Swiss-Prot record:
Protein name stated in the entry: Putative translationally-controlled tumor protein-like protein TPT1P8
Domain called TCTP: residue spans: 1-139
Native source species: Homo sapiens (Human)
Origin superkingdom: Eukaryota
Pfam families listed in its UniProt record: TCTP (PF00838)
GO molecular function, one term: calcium ion binding
Compositionally biased residues, Polar residues: 40-51
Taxonomic path: Eukaryota, Metazoa, Chordata, Craniata, Vertebrata
Gene Ontology terms: biological process: apoptotic process
Family (UniProt): Belongs to the TCTP family.
Residues covered by region (Disordered): 40-60
GO cellular component: cytoplasm
């Protein structure tokens, strides 16, 4: 299994168990996600070896809770971030600057492609800012 890490923080982001597409000429990765529902608190009597007919005749009420989340968030301990539009712009600008510096050190031939590709990508991400949530790795 391949674990993808953030270039700057080196924190785990996702693994290759998900469908992954390269977008923006290979500058970004898009990862497929699915919604999961998990029920907690309701245990089936057969799983614990309890014979309900020989025990109490009273009906016992057990509470159960259904938790719905995105699989990649749950499996890789990501946290939803809450940004204002201005804070998001600043965060993206600082993050892109950090990536640019890393590219200059490690792969200088990709710097120009990165700068032009990210100008287009960051303006697109600002357009869809209101309809999506941003996820950050848990540190």
């Amino acid at each position: 299994m391949i674990i993808f890490q953030d270039l700057i923080s080196h924190n785990e982001m996702f693994s290759d168990i998900y469908k992954i597409w390269e977008i923006t000429n290979g500058l970004c990765l898009e990862v497929e996600q699915k919604m999961l529902s998990k029920t907690t608190g309701n245990t089936d009597d057969s799983l614990i070896g309890r014979n309900s007919s020989s025990e109490s005749t009273e009906d016992e009420v057990t509470e159960s809770t259904i938790i719905t989340s995105v699989d990649i968030v749950t499996n890789h301990h990501l946290q939803e971030s809450i940004f204002t539009k201005e804070a998001y712009k600043k965060y993206i600008k600082d993050y892109m600057k950090s990536i640019n510096e890393k590219l200059e050190e490690q792969r200088p031939e990709r710097v120009k492609l990165f700068i032009t590709g990210m100008k287009n990508k960051s303006s697109t991400s600002l357009l869809i800012f209101k309809t999506t949530s941003s996820l950050l790795v848990k540190t």
